[in-house]
Amino acid sequence: LQKGLQLSFFRSRKLSDQEYFFNSYFDELSVRLRDVSADQLGELSQVFVNVRDKGGKVIIIGNGGSAAIASHVAVDLTKAARVRAINFNEADLITCFGNDYGYENWMGKALEFYSDAGDVAVIISSSGESQNVVIGAKAARDLGLQVVTLSGFRADNSLRAIGHLNLWVNSESYNIVETTHQSWLLAVIDRLVEAGQ
């Protein structure tokens, strides 16, 4: 199991019983997918529609698995929903800005260089505590961007306090949190496509 997996229901029975493990795992995932309301996802949908209609773009950032989500969602937003979206996953960009400004500052500096007035920053972090993500979110606010955060773990994590719209997963399992974040974002894209927006 991934280090740090802290879901209590996994401890109530031996993990050698794979049927129990997977049933419990998917039950928990199903519950966590409902940590957000339809109104919140509808609000995010409208954020995307508004930025597109105003000629802006969505910038999606994260570390590790969250960066992978950023790549997937940026492509689908652009291609399927016609909302221009980018991410900052290029190794040359990360190493350049990390080397010149410090790893903790690279996201904030990249936002400074690549964002335009009226853009939206979607900032993803399972823990909501990664220093570069928190600094990046604060930089986005300072730049006047609309900030959407997706986080998990503690309800009072640092990232969740920064965004204009904050979506939170009540779990301390990285994979549960990341799968939920990606599912929420892709559901919003599918909703935009279905609604013809």
Which ranges hold each PLM region?
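A short, well-structured juxtamembrane/interface segment
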Residues: 34-54
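Glycine-rich, small/polar surface segments that engage phosphate groups of diverse ligands
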Residues: 47-115, 120
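Short glycine/serine/threonine-rich phosphate/pyrophosphate-binding segments
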Residues: 66-71, 129-136
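A charged, well-structured terminal subsegment
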Residues: 121, 175-197
